[in-house]
């Protein structure tokens, strides 16, 4: 029996930093952050963009570790990099994006 390992991942991993805002970042819950990401995708790519599946892998204070499908990576990066939530002045800054989870190293 030959074991086969896939070296090409189907997923992309993204590290975001939540920046700015009048509300302290630690007080924003995960559902609100997910809503911000959906709004960013909707603003850039409409209703079809908001349907792009994104998984929250981990949250460490103001850093978010996300996973999306490799084919959607460019759309997700464009949408997140250009979105600013107006009343609160919250924006999502992309720090790192990779196709391998080992390259998405947590910040200390």
Curated annotation (Swiss-Prot):
GO terms for cellular component: cytosol; nucleolar ribonuclease P complex; nucleus; ribonuclease MRP complex. It catalyses: Endonucleolytic cleavage of RNA, removing 5'-extranucleotides from tRNA precursor. InterPro entries: Pop8, Pop8-like_dom, Rnp2-like_sf. Its main location: nucleus. Its EC number is 3.1.26.5. SUPFAM superfamilies: Rnp2-like. Transmembrane segments: none annotated. Keywords: Hydrolase, Nucleus, tRNA processing. GO terms for biological process: endonucleolytic cleavage in ITS1 to separate SSU-rRNA from 5.8S rRNA and LSU-rRNA from tricistronic rRNA transcript (SSU-rRNA, 5.8S rRNA, LSU-rRNA); intronic box C/D snoRNA processing; nuclear-transcribed mRNA catabolic process, RNase MRP-dependent; tRNA processing. It is an enzyme of class 3 (hydrolase). One of its GO terms (molecular function) is ribonuclease P activity. It is found in: Nucleus. The keyword tRNA processing applies. Part of ribonuclease P, a protein complex that generates mature tRNA molecules by cleaving their 5'-ends. This is Probable ribonucleases P protein subunit pop8. It comes from Schizosaccharomyces pombe (strain 972 / ATCC 24843) (Fission yeast).
């Amino acid at each position: 029996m030959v074991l086969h390992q896939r070296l090409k991942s189907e997923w992309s991993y993204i590290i975001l930093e939540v920046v700015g805002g009048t509300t302290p970042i630690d007080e924003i819950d995960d559902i609100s952050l997910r809503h911000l990401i959906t709004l960013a995708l909707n603003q850039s790519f409409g209703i079809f963009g908001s349907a792009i599946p994104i998984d929250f892998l981990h949250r460490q204070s103001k850093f978010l570790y996300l996973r999306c499908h490799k084919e959607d990576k460019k759309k997700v990066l464009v949408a997140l990099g250009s979105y600013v939530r107006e009343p609160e002045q919250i924006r999502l800054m992309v720090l790192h994006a990779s196709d391998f989870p080992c390259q998405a190293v947590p910040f200390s």
